[in-house]
Amino acid sequence: MTKIITSPSFITQLREQIEYPNAGVFSKVLLKDNACQYTLFCLAANTDISEHTSIRNATINVIEGRGLLTLSGEDIVLENGIFVFMPANAPHALKAEENLTFLLTLSEKVTDKN
């Protein structure tokens, strides 16, 4: 389900969008435009996402579950209500300790024009 923005608003109940796979990752792009993309990630317990980077800034907003994010070498416990900002090109990895759902927002990296 991807919704391209055609009106000024979009509303959904995130908990109704959650779908856990038996193993691994299920992701669903909820909304995107030229500057941002909003993707719901549902990870089955014991799922690992190996270290990688992104050319875009990102935020993680945890909806439910528990996991561990390693961001630029720092371990961050992910649990309901946690919000994390990840700058573009920051190395990060993730392990879902139990079923874990979060909203990932990708946004354009702002270039310093000075």
Give residue ranges: language-model regions.
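A short, N-terminal "cap"/entry segment at the start of jelly-roll beta-barrel domains
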Residues: M1-A35, T70
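Conserved short histidine dyad/triad with adjacent acidic residue
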Residues: G24, Q37-S54
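A cytosolic small-molecule/anion-sensing beta-strand core signal
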Residues: I63-E64, E79-N80, E98
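Short acidic-glycine-tyrosine-enriched beta hairpin
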Residues: G73-A88
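Ligand-binding loop in jelly-roll beta-barrel domains
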Residues: A88-T111
